[in-house]
């Protein structure tokens, strides 16, 4: 592992070519590097125009440079930034000039953010929010990530931890009295009252049913059904481009095709699967096996049938339902040819839609319904928990608080449960016992962040 005392540098903006590029340097040598390349240091936190030079005094670029002395910087260390023209040659020359300085090395993925975390500029939940913000594809993902970055969960966790410590102080005082054979109720009762309020608040957060976690990853919708009913044509309609091969021959789709949709800010991944039938071809058999597996994991399955022969898919649909599969919508396709659909599939009780994937009839209504489904199953504006790590630690915190409440007057055991609860919230914030997960979390970041 690299030393945190080393100075690091990296491109912190998009890849060239671009109008501008930002190269960031962080660490004890940042001022030396900036002065060598720009000629002098600008006033702290003020932009300065400078002609950059390499080690042989050859000019590189007319740029803007900034200087952020520690601790008032993004990482908490000395930080220099070079705002340069975003051509490949310019960037390469600036990176080369920086790299010729001693005690410098290229930054690892997420290393700037990790240094900010280690220097107390943000807690672990806020760092995770920053990672989510970088990877947000939709507006609602962006909003949720920004709330996390701004400390929505971290602030609540710090408040809870402070209340637990206050309750612990009362219990510890009661322990002192217990040594004398008397446990005063006026100490234990208010402590347990605090704990009960905290437990109710945490249980309310845990009751959010993982919707915010789901918003990070998005819903998965599988298009399933018998072969040659128009699944690939529907996939192309949803994607508004040709992503799947359309053929009159059954069994054309043999692998799984994915399309990512943004439905009113909600992320939805639609997968087109091989037609469900008893296949003879080994390749098609494997496609059917994969289709069944992925569809079983999906949040919603669109069972597509030919409106001219809707009953042909009924037995297969009921077979899936008998296996405990849920979340089905029946979609009757080819109504442009068949007219009003026939069959008894609506008797299954699942929502039914009539469309023509060929000319787009009814597809807008299907997409609108998918958007409503996503809104009903993904997080709201007040959601706090966005990762399984958050949920696990809050559940452990709540369990410890619950045990503390259930203990009668065993003050030493109550104190221990409160210590466990405070420790779990410390882990949530990244302040205790998290070294083993830091590498995993910050490795998800891009280089330069």
From Swiss-Prot:
User: Which prosthetic group or cofactor does it need?
Assistant: K(+)
Q: Which SUPFAM superfamilies match?
A: P-loop containing nucleoside triphosphate hydrolases, TrmE connector domain
Gene Ontology CC terms = cytoplasm
Subcellular locations according to the entry: Cytoplasm
Under Gene Ontology molecular function, one entry of this record is:
GTPase activity
Q: Where does GTP bind?
A: 228-233, 247-253, 272-275
EC main group: hydrolase
According to its UniProt entry, the protein's GO biological process terms are: tRNA methylation; tRNA wobble uridine modification
Report the co-factor binding details: Binds 1 potassium ion per subunit.
- Residue numbers binding (6S)-5-formyl-5,6,7,8-tetrahydrofolate: 24, 81, 121, 449
Residues forming the TrmE-type G domain are 218-375
Question: Which key words tag this protein in UniProt?
Answer: Cytoplasm, GTP-binding, Hydrolase, Magnesium, Metal-binding, Nucleotide-binding, Potassium, tRNA processing
Q: Does the keyword Endoplasmic reticulum apply?
A: no
Q: Which CDD domains match?
A: trmE, TrmE_N
A Pfam family that this protein carries is TrmE_N
Q: Where does Mg(2+) bind?
A: 232, 253
Q: Does the keyword Secreted apply?
A: no
Q: What is its EC number?
A: 3.6.-.-
How is the quaternary structure described? Answer: Homodimer. Heterotetramer of two MnmE and two MnmG subunits.
Q: What does this protein do?
A: Exhibits a very high intrinsic GTPase hydrolysis rate. Involved in the addition of a carboxymethylaminomethyl (cmnm) group at the wobble position (U34) of certain tRNAs, forming tRNA-cmnm(5)s(2)U34.
Q: Which family does it belong to?
A: Belongs to the TRAFAC class TrmE-Era-EngA-EngB-Septin-like GTPase superfamily. TrmE GTPase family.
The name on file for this protein is tRNA modification GTPase MnmE
The organism of origin for this protein:
Rhodopseudomonas palustris (strain BisB18)
Per the record, the gene is mnmE
């Amino acid at each position: 592992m690299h030393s945190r005392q080393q100075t690091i540098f990296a491109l912190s903006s998009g890849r060239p070519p671009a109008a501008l590029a930002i190269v960031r340097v962080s660490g004890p040598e940042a001022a030396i590097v900036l002065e060598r390349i720009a000629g002098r240091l600008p006033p702290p936190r003020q932009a300065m125009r400078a002609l950059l030079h390499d080690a042989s005094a050859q000019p590189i670029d007319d740029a803007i440079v900034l200087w952020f002395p520690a601790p008032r910087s993004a990482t908490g260390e000395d930080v220099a930034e070079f705002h340069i023209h975003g051509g490949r040659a310019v960037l390469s020359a600036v990176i080369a000039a920086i790299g010729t300085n001693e005690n410098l090395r290229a930054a690892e993925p997420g290393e700037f953010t990790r240094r900010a975390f280690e220097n107390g500029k943000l807690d672990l939940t806020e760092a995770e929010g920053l990672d989510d913000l970088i990877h947000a594809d939709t507006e609602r993902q962006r909003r949720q990530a920004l709330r996390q970055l701004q400390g929505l969960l971290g602030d609540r966790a710090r408040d809870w931890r402070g209340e637990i410590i206050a309750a612990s102080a009362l219990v510890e005082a009661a322990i002192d009295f217990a040594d004398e054979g008397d446990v005063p109720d006026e100490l234990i009762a208010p402590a347990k009252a605090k704990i009960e309020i905290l437990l109710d608040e945490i249980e309310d957060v845990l009751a959010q049913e993982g919707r915010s976690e789901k918003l990070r990853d998005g819903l998965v919708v599988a298009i399933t059904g018998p072969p040659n009913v128009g699944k690939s044509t529907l996939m192309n309609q949803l994607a508004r481009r040709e992503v799947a091969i359309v053929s009159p021959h059954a069994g054309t789709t043999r692998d799984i095709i994915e399309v990512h949709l943004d439905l009113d800010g909600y992320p939805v991944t639609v997968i087109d699967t091989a037609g469900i039938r008893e296949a003879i071809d080994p390749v098609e058999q494997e496609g059917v096996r994969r289709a069944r597996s992925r569809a079983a994991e999906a949040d919603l399955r669109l069972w597509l049938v030919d409106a001219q022969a809707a009953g042909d898919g009924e037995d297969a649909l009921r077979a899936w339902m008998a296996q405990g599969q849920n979340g089905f919508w029946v979609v009757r396709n080819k109504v442009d040819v068949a007219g009003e659909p026939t069959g008894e599939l609506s008797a299954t009780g699942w929502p039914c839609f009539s469309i023509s994937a060929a000319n787009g009839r009814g597809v807008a209504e299907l997409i609108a319904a998918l958007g409503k489904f996503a809104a009903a199953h993904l997080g709201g504006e007040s959601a706090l928990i966005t990762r399984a790590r958050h949920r696990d630690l809050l559940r452990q915190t709540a369990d410890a608080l619950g045990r503390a409440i259930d203990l009668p007057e065993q003050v030493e055991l109550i104190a221990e449960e409160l210590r466990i609860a405070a420790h779990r919230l410390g882990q949530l914030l990244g302040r205790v016992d998290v070294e083993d997960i830091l590498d995993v979390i910050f490795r998800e970041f891009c280089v330069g962040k």
